[in-house]
Amino acid sequence: TLKSYNPDTKVNIHEEPISSLNAMEIIKDYDIIVNGADNFPTRYLVNDASYMSGKPLVDGSILLFDGQATTFLAGEGCYRCLFPTPPPPGEVPSCAEAGVLGMLPGMVGTIQATEVVKLILGIGETLSGRLLLIDALSMEYRTVKLRRDPKCPLCGDNPTVTELIDYEAFCGGASLIG
């Protein structure tokens, strides 16, 4: 366990799945939020809760042979700026349906951990404002610029999402549990 490596480590166990009812309570004690969820409802929920709490969000995702990672900081955009609406149900297969190259979660997770260390220590340049794309088949990494969308329903100039919503309904019935 983590405590065997460092007895001063504090491990908080949350036995219930994250939801609109408990997300703000769960994340309130954390300085940085890291999301690697494999479903759209949870990704939108964690994004919205992080933004509403003013917490940095280090986000990563994988599917098949592709991965991506970014960091969302206050005032610099959010997941909804990148993906204003979820894809229609069934358009994007789940990781369980499509599969994932076994090494890819470790690659993206290591990038996310590096982002967290940079945020904690205040060093280096985070991925804020950039989306890192990984193509494991060609082993090419590239970045694309991300910008805050003034029309974003969450962080835009005239937000319409001002509280946590029913994310399963928003995502067309997809479950919060991947």
Task: Please annotate each region the language model reported.
Residues 1-178:
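Adenine nucleotide-associated cytosolic modules
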